[in-house]
């Protein structure tokens, strides 16, 4: 009996030892799946009140679909009431598998949430706002010229981040997206990565872009169509110029192309477009190369001036937006003239003239502003964006546009860069027209931080 007891105790001890020595199997946490989509951008290439084009790089997975609606269901794709498959793809172009999905029949001045679902996953939820079909105040940002490396890349990123903080209705990017001739795949991928990551607001709002062709896209003059699905004219894919309308008859923007024939078909198209929209309150033209650069390192664009400037006067263009020179400038209202008192084909005319605004330096190294004219209101050498506030007529104020120049980076004499904006408090959907603290304006007197169209002289 005693022997059996000892055996049972021994067996029990062995069992306890073995049980204690067994290590429970621990399942490591699953790594989040790598995203199947990247490089999102929203493009306005049609009626911005009812359409928008969602563009992205499909990294892997099949059968992607954009699910969207006016209520936020986060990533519960099946709850969104609308869905749309890609309407176009450009597989392999610039090393990407770009998909375009055009959303139509949207309601004006509304928020829409969207996600992309494919065979392998669900993307992040983002949102956008359509433009109003009636005259309502809005803001937009304009600028151009970025580079793909060094301090110029850093400066461009500072400008990108300002977009997210100021929440404009849209951005006009006025050409020269990358270094080189626009054919380098890695540079485009970098630009698109930065655009998505830095111009999206902290609550997921994406800002539509209105792309314009610049000389650094001349290696392939179809590139903006193949990466942004922008329109072209006369069945010629290189003839990238188009126009958009905002707020009923409040605001019309014309995206021209200074890198293809400015006369001929483009001039005819421009005159027809201006004629059809001549009764709009504001008409704005954007194009990469300015007529009269404000730096001696850039040549005059006389043929372009001859083709377009007379039409701008004839149809009373409000503002002309140029880039290319890598510096900042704003003119008084000017019109084409060879009369006494004119200079380089322009004369100041506060009643019928156009205010010309520019000239690039979103990120590219600033050039000296060493070619001012008698009709130059202000110029400067720094990285910058232009922030426009557009207001329709009210009971107590006529329609007007306020133009702000925001400095995003400067360089000292040793080429050391200082960027601005990290301490700027982001705007919200409730205060889109407020001026946030710590915004670094270019504000020489007597006009200070704001230049207004129609122009108002300040003493």
Predicted regions and their residues:
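Positively charged n-region of N-terminal signal peptides that target proteins for export
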Residues: 1-5
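Bacterial N-terminal signal peptides
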Residues: 9-16
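Acidic, histidine-bearing metal-coordination/catalytic regions of metal-dependent phosphoesterases
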Residues: 16-142, 395-459
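Acidic/histidine-rich helix-loop elements
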Residues: 72-98, 139-157, 181, 225-234, ...
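Extended active-site neighborhood of metal-dependent phosphoesterases/phosphodiesterases
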Residues: 100-102, 111-127, 185-279, 307, ...
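An acidic-aromatic substrate-binding cleft motif
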Residues: 121-180
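Active-site glycine-centered loops adjacent to acidic/histidine catalytic or metal-binding residues
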Residues: 145, 175-176, 214-215, 256, ...
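His/acidic metal-ligating clusters that form di-metal
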Residues: 161-170, 199-208, 252, 258-352, ...
């Amino acid at each position: 009996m005693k022997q059996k007891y000892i055996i049972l105790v021994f067996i029990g001890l062995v069992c306890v030892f073995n049980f204690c020595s067994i290590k429970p199997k621990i399942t490591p946490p699953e790594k989040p799946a790598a995203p199947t989509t990247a490089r999102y951008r929203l493009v306005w290439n049609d009626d911005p009140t009812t359409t928008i084009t969602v563009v992205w790089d499909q990294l892997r997975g099949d059968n992607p679909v954009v699910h969207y609606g006016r209520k936020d269901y986060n990533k519960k794709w099946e709850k969104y009431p609308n869905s749309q498959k890609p309407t176009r793809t450009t597989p392999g172009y610039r090393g990407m598998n770009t998909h375009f999905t055009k959303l139509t029949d949207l309601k004006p001045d509304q928020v829409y949430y969207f996600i992309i679902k494919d065979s392998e996953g669900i993307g992040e939820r983002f949102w956008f706002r359509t433009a109003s079909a009636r005259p309502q105040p809005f803001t937009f940002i304009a600028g151009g010229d970025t580079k793909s490396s060094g301090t110029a890349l850093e400066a461009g990123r500072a400008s990108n981040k300002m977009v997210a903080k100021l929440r404009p209705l849209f951005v006009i990017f006025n050409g020269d997206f990358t270094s080189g001739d626009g054919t380098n795949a890695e540079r485009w991928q970098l630009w698109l990565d930065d655009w998505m990551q830095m111009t999206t607001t902290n609550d997921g709002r994406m800002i539509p872009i209105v792309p314009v062709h610049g000389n650094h896209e001349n290696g392939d003059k179809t590139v903006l169509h193949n990466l942004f699905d922008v329109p072209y004219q006369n069945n010629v894919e290189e003839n990238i110029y188009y126009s958009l309308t905002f707020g009923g008859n409040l605001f019309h923007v014309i995206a021209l192309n200074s890198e293809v024939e400015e006369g001929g078909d483009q001039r005819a198209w421009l005159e027809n477009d201006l004629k059809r929209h001549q009764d709009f309150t504001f008409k704005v033209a954007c194009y990469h190369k300015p007529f009269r650069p404000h730096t001696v390192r850039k040549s005059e664009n006389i043929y372009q001036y001859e083709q377009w400037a007379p039409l701008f006067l004839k149809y009373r263009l409000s503002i002309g937006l140029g880039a290319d020179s890598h510096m900042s400038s704003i003119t008084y209202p000017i019109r084409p003239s060879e009369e006494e008192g004119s200079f380089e084909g322009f004369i100041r005319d506060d009643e019928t003239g156009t205010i010309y605004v520019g000239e690039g330096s979103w990120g590219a190294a600033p050039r000296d502003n060493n070619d001012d004219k008698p009709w130059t209101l202000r110029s400067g050498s720094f990285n910058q964006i232009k922030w426009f506030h557009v207001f329709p007529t009210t009971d107590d104020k006529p329609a007007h546009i306020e133009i702000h120049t925001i400095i995003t980076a400067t360089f000292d004499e040793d080429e050391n860069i200082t960027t601005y904006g990290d301490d700027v408090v982001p705007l919200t959907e409730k205060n889109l027209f407020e001026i946030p603290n710590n915004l670094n304006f270019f504000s020489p007197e007597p006009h200070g931080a704001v230049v207004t169209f129609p122009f108002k002289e300040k003493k």
